[in-house]
């Protein structure tokens, strides 16, 4: 299957108080315009959707400038074989910030994930993603590199045992704001 789509989104963000950092209200109105393609179905080798567009967020406070940029989004799965799938993701959006003098952040993420079923009940997933955050109107740039490994053992339809490791390397051009973290989780999940 193959389909072309267009998407228009509007938002209104209202906050009860102004930001403590600079006294400006972060209330805003925003729009997102996207055009893209949707292709494939569950049984096909390649399936997913991709879009490109434009987004803007207009603060109600005249002391802050508009935040806008090109939006690129994708979620594409490629089934290499019955037990193995690669997934490519890309996301772009505008987020609020209370950073002094900035109305928002243009955030861009790109990632790759591999999923392999060793058996029907043993599945491993490895992923890596990079995020760049560009602050509007201030010289702050931040990036994040995230890698993860997940192993799942399905006991039955309801219970899953899992082990997960994730590392995050956060980098900022602001002194003292860079950090690295590792997270290990082991547990059981119940779904019904």
Question: Where do the language-model regions lie?
Answer:
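Acidic, glycine-rich loop-and-beta core segments that form the ion-binding/anion-interacting portion
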Residues: 9-73
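Repeated loop/turn-to-beta-strand initiation elements of outer-membrane beta-barrel proteins
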Residues: 1-6, 43-50, 82-88, 120-126, ...
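Residues on the lipid-exposed face of transmembrane beta-strands in outer-membrane beta-barrel proteins
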Residues: 35-39, 74-78, 112-116, 149-153, ...
